[in-house]
Every structure is written in structure tokens, then in C-alpha cells.
């Protein structure tokens, strides 16, 4: 099975739980044993690829800036790529540039995804019950790519993935383990990056 094969399942859940006029946002990056798999919460309409007329890749954070600033600050993307991102307005992100950014993510052996793939109009919080509908699919995603470590953003996402109550503030530099298909993965819960949030994990 490939990551691509999961898209039809995500699209069904978008119809059920997402904004009717927007498409699912899937994932992007290195799909072959990445060093880090980043798991965010769920996409919003700020991602230019959520528009139904968009025919390019539908990966997280396209047409936005804050997350890329964060990745640059912890040396996960090059200064050259970061500067090009900063120069662009959302409407200037064309298919070619989106591929260029994710080529960098792939080359750095990173994979970016969301627990929930159901795109919302804005950053409204989703109830646990909705995010849990995506858990089995996320585990399939992880099983396909086999990341070395997983970083989960925020209490809600971390708690659902680890199946126990997690307070990120009490988990600085600590990891938990999950088992998926007889493989064990280290999971590091970190603060959800709001604005210029920073990772609470040493590189």
C-alpha cells in the first residue's frame, strides 16, 4: 500500500466532517523512512490547495508562512527556501513553487501530515470524536512511511494518538511509545505552534 491509496478514504471523511466547498489536505514529504513525521491537527481554508479548483499537490501549509518560519528557525529548511516563501503572497504560490517547497521537505527527510484531514473554513477546534475517525488512517500512513520519530502538536492530537491524557507542558523532552503493526515508534508531544511558537524538543 502507498500513502496515495489513502486519499479516497480521506475524501469520504471530508464530505462528512469538512467544509463542503473545500477539499481534503493530505500530507507531503519523504515517504521512505523519514527522520521525522510531524503530525498537526487539521487543515484550514487558508491552505491554497484546499480550493476545489486546485489541481496541484494537496499538502499541509501551502500558501502560509508561520510554520515555515518555525521550520527555518530549527534548521529544517534552508535559508534560500525560507526567503522565497517569505517573499510570496498566498496567490503567488503556483504548482511549481509548492512542489519546490516539498522537494526541500523530502530532501531533508521530513514528512508533514495532519491527524484530521477534514479542511475547515477557519481554525475552529474539532471535537475528539471527529479526530478519532482519522486515527486508523493515520496509523496506516505511519506504517507505510516508517518514520524514525514522530512529533505530535498540542495536547489534543498527542492525547488521541497516544490514547492517554497528555499535557505537553509536563512532557518537555520526553517521549512515549506507540506500536503499529509490530513496529514501535517514539512519539514526542510538543506545543502547538501558534504564531512564532517553538518546538520544546532538542534537535
Where are each of the predicted segments found?
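Short, intrinsically disordered, charge-balanced linker/junction segments flanking boundaries
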Residues: 201-203
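Active-site-adjacent alpha-helix of alpha/beta-hydrolase-fold enzymes
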Residues: 178-181
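Catalytic phosphate/metal-binding cores of nucleic-acid and nucleotide-processing enzymes, i.e., regions
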Residues: 169-176
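A polyanion-binding, active-site-adjacent surface
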Residues: 1-149, 155-169, 185-198
Amino acid at each position: 500500500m502507498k500513502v496515495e491509496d489513502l486519499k479516497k478514504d480521506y475524501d469520504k471523511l471530508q464530505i462528512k466532517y469538512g467544509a463542503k466547498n473545500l477539499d481534503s489536505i493530505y500530507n507531503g514529504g519523504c515517504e521512505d523512512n523519514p527522520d521525522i513525521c510531524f503530525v498537526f491537527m487539521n487543515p484550514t481554508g487558508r491552505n491554497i490547495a484546499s480550493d476545489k479548483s486546485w489541481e496541484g499537490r494537496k499538502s499541509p501549509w501551502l500558501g502560509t508562512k508561520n510554520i515555515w518560519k518555525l521550520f527555518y528557525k530549527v534548521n529544517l529548511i534552508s535559508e534560500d527556501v525560507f526567503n522565497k516563501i517569505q517573499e510570496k503572497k498566498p496567490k503567488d504560490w503556483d504548482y511549481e513553487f509548492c512542489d519546490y517547497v516539498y522537494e526541500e521537505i523530502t530532501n531533508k527527510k521530513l514528512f508533514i501530515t495532519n491527524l484530521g484531514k477534514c479542511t475547515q473554513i477557519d481554525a475552529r477546534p474539532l471535537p475528539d470524536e471527529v479526530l478519532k475517525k482519522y486515527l486508523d488512517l493515520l496509523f496506516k500512513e505511519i506504517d507505510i512511511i516508517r518514520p524514525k520519530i514522530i512529533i505530535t502538536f498540542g495536547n489534543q492530537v498527542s492525547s488521541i494518538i497516544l490514547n492517554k491524557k497528555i499535557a505537553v507542558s509536563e512532557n518537555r523532552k520526553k517521549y512515549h511509545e506507540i506500536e503499529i503493526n509490530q513496529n514501535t515508534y517514539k512519539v514526542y508531544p510538543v506545543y502547538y505552534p501558534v504564531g512564532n511558537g517553538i518546538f520544546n524538543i532538542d534537535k
